[in-house]
Structure formats: C-alpha cells, structure tokens
Amino acid sequence: MMRTPGLLGLRGFVAFAAKLWSFVLYLLRRQVRTIIQYQTVRYDVLPLSPASRNRLSQVKRKVLVLDLDETLIHSHHDGVLRPTVRPGTPPDFILKVVIDKHPVRFFVHKRPHVDFFLEVVSQWYELVVFTASMEIYGSAVADKLDNNRGVLRRRFYRQHCTLELGSYIKDLSVVHSDLSSVVILDNSPGAYRSHPDNAIPIKSWFSDPSDTALLNLLPMLDALRFTADVRSVLSRNLHQHRLW
C-alpha cells in the first residue's frame, strides 16, 4: 500500500507534537518542584516565656534520631529508575560512591522543606542520623544534608543495626542510654519495633513535590522537648504505626 506524502507529513507532525508536549510537561514539573521546594516557609519560633524557659531548664535536652531514605530523601542508582520517580524529575544532587569495587551513582531527591526542617529542629534537639544503609552511602547523603552546618555530626549506619528475619532493627540504646530523651523519626515501623514508644511515624516519601509532612511535625516536635519523658506522649500514637 502506497503512503501518500500527506499521510507521512501528518504522522511526522503528530510525532513532533508529542515530543514537544513531553518537553513542556518536563519544564512544568521542574518549575513546580522548584517553586515548592524553595518557596519561603515560616514557622515562627517565638521567644519563650519565663515559665517556658524555667520548664525547659528542668528537663534534659532531647535527641532526635533521623532516618534518611524515604524519610528525608529518596534516591535511585544507575540503571534503576523506580516507577515512584517521575521521568524527567531532576535530582537535587548526585553521589558517586564505590561499592564492592564498582563505581555507583546515586540520584538523590530531597523531601520538600527538609533544609528548613533541619534548620529549625537543630535549635531544639541534638540531631542524630540513623540509617540502615551502608556507611559509604549514608555518610555522603548526611554530608549533603548537613551542608557544613555541623548539625548532623553523630551518625549510625547498617553496622549499628540488628538483623532480624531479614530486616534491620535500630536499637536506640546505642544512641543514648536514657530513652526518655530519645525520639526517632522513621518511615518504617519495623526499624523501631523495639522502641515504638519513642517513635514518630511519617509517611514514606518518593516524589510528591507538594508533600508537607516535615512541616506538619514542627509543632509537635516543638512541644515534645518540654516533656520529662517523651514516651509519656508518644506511647499514645501506637495506633498510627503500621505494623511490620
């Protein structure tokens, strides 16, 4: 069957239009991500009243343990583009590490508002990174998030976890002996199964640019630092933990 020049021209135009539309969508996604990630966000840290200052002086400074993957960031490596990451979404940074003598690139996406979150909570808590990832990767991610601020100096990795039935369990006693002062923020309930009364659950994050989960936690974290024992409050959140 002969193809007429008109038909060939129409198909060429349709193919060009499809590519153009894909490019426009890519630019729009990138612009929306930039606007949301870097928009001005405020959480007013008001001066403490004399009563609040007195209360804070009577309790120990708390420790906030932070998970990395799907809590503060999401990443994928060479050749593995997870369906949760929208095609064309640019990473916030790229890490180059060597694993088992093989160079690997990780494309890392930061959860919306993570920089602002770290800036605020570092004024209230001693921050600790605790990830089940390998140290060579987790350390590089933590360095990027810290950005020379010195707020993520203490770090624990896979070798500090306990392996049970194929899952890595985080023992908070290696972070601090007094668990009344320790809070862990982690998207995986299985990771803190030994310490559910110390945990704040957070939804796993992969690519949603409109996510505000970190911002939503600021009022709770602000109030929690005044408690004598964080477990007296967090033990009431057990219904929010999706069991492992």
From Swiss-Prot:
Location relative to the cell: Membrane; Cytoplasm, Perinuclear region
What UniProt keywords are attached to this protein's entry? Answer: Cytoplasm, Developmental protein, Differentiation, Hydrolase, Membrane, Neurogenesis, Protein phosphatase, Transmembrane, Transmembrane helix
GO CC: one term?
perinuclear region of cytoplasm
Q: Name one GO biological process term.
A: positive regulation of triglyceride biosynthetic process
Matching CDD domains, A to Z? HAD_FCP1-like (cd07521)
Chain ranges of the FCP1 homology domain: 57-224
EC top class named in words: hydrolase
- SUPFAM superfamilies membership: HAD-like
Enumerate the transmembrane spans. Answer: 7-29
Q: Name one Pfam family in it.
A: NIF
**InterPro entries in the cross-refs:** Dullard_phosphatase (IPR011948), FCP1_dom (IPR004274), HAD-like_sf (IPR036412), HAD_sf (IPR023214), TIM50 (IPR050365)
* UniProt membrane topology term: Single-pass membrane protein
Q: Please give the Gene Ontology molecular function terms for this protein.
A: phosphoprotein phosphatase activity; protein serine/threonine phosphatase activity
Q: Reaction(s) catalyzed by this protein?
A: O-phospho-L-seryl-[protein] + H2O = L-seryl-[protein] + phosphate; O-phospho-L-threonyl-[protein] + H2O = L-threonyl-[protein] + phosphate
Question: In the Enzyme Commission scheme, what number(s) does this protein have?
Answer: 3.1.3.16
Q: What does the subunit comment say? A: Interacts with bmpr1a, bmpr1b and bmpr2.
Q: Which NCBIfam families match?
A: HIF-SF_euk
This molecule's function is given as: Serine/threonine protein phosphatase that may dephosphorylate and activate lipins. Lipins are phosphatidate phosphatases that catalyze the conversion of phosphatidic acid to diacylglycerol and control the metabolism of fatty acids at different levels. May indirectly modulate the lipid composition of nuclear and/or endoplasmic reticulum membranes and be required for proper nuclear membrane morphology and/or dynamics. May also indirectly regulate the production of lipid droplets and triacylglycerol. Induces neuronal differentiation by antagonizing BMP signaling.
What the record says about family reads: Belongs to the dullard family.
Q: What is this protein called?
A: CTD nuclear envelope phosphatase 1
From what organism does this protein derive?
A: Xenopus tropicalis (Western clawed frog)
